[in-house]
Amino acid sequence: MRPVPCTYIRGGTSRALFFMEKDLPQDKSLWPGLFMKALGVRRTPAGLSAMGMDFPTHKVAVISPHKGPDADVDYNFFQIDSENDYVDNRGNCGNMSSAVGPFAIDEGLVEAREPETLVRIYNTNTRRIITSRVQVKDGRSCTQGDAVVCGVPGTGSPVWLSFENPGGGLTGKLFPTGNKTDYFAIPGREDLPVTLIDCANPVVLFRAADAGLTGTELTSLNSRKDFIDLVGRVRGMAAQVFGLADRWEDAAAKSTYMPFVGIVSPPQTYKDMDGNQVEAGSMDVCCRSFITRLHRAYPIAASIATAAAAKIAGTVAYDVARRPEEGKGPEAGALPADGAVTGPEAGRPELQASSASRIILGHAGGCTAVEVETAGEEVVRGTVLRTACIIMKGILWVEE
């Protein structure tokens, strides 16, 4: 058995195993096998003698010091598909990004400064910088606070995440086809208008009405074979466009994590997964997220992409979003975005006239506010509020 230091952390509405890169084999080709043994995923010999749980997917983060002046730490994210024994590191997890700053502070990778420490994170998956503002006390990250995140019980210490220049991390373009709206040919249906956007992660959006939905549906959709087949087809076709699968039919096994599917509709009143009423006036876009089943909230990377699309004319999200003149949803907390352009983009004059807007997404778990800063049709940054907490820290014994 191989002893490996490990930390189990909740970030937003997700959880992951965190490893320091120095504690893993130098040969990175050995990492996928180690991760699967650590999690005890299906068809690995570890089985019950591991950290795995009855989930179809698992998450792993590997952290190391950054070697340049533009960031403090490197963050490499891995999605483990236990049903297909597949490890994918082509995209990021926005929720788990919120745990990187607290972890880096507590591991001594970043000097703790009270009351707030700024951690600059280089996400190796998307090759983009994420800045994390973490509350600190007595040299460690705080876990207790009054921040509320939909989909997470109770309150916690706020972690503000800003995804810097999030467009084109996978494909090199915000809109990889060059179009704000494309049309997918779906057998037995009229061509489906979709928006393909690569922003924090690749996402495909379509309007609920175009699929015969109201947009307020919840878990009942999981048992509708016609709808699941439609989502699978749309995901597969989008995966092919994004370069994640050679054929759309391969996406179900070869790109189980990306792209996210977002279904958008105008603001409307509904009850969330916990039975709480969400008012139409509290949101700018009503949305639902799917991969193979309904997401209980809305993925953070997909939130950045959806909110950005809602600001850009010609997308399906813009078509259904509340316009400013129609009245804005209520403020959901002060986001630390002052509209100034900082960092490596500060010297670009075309970005100095950027505009920031609060976009509130109403989803299955409640509402999420995203501060989106754009310059024309370029996304400068997207900022969200999350919470994070360490669940366990210790030694994980992994079969050799």
Regions found by a protein language model. Give the residues of each.
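A glycine-rich beta-to-alpha transition motif near the start of alpha/beta enzyme domains, typified by
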Residues: 1-331, 335-339, 343-400
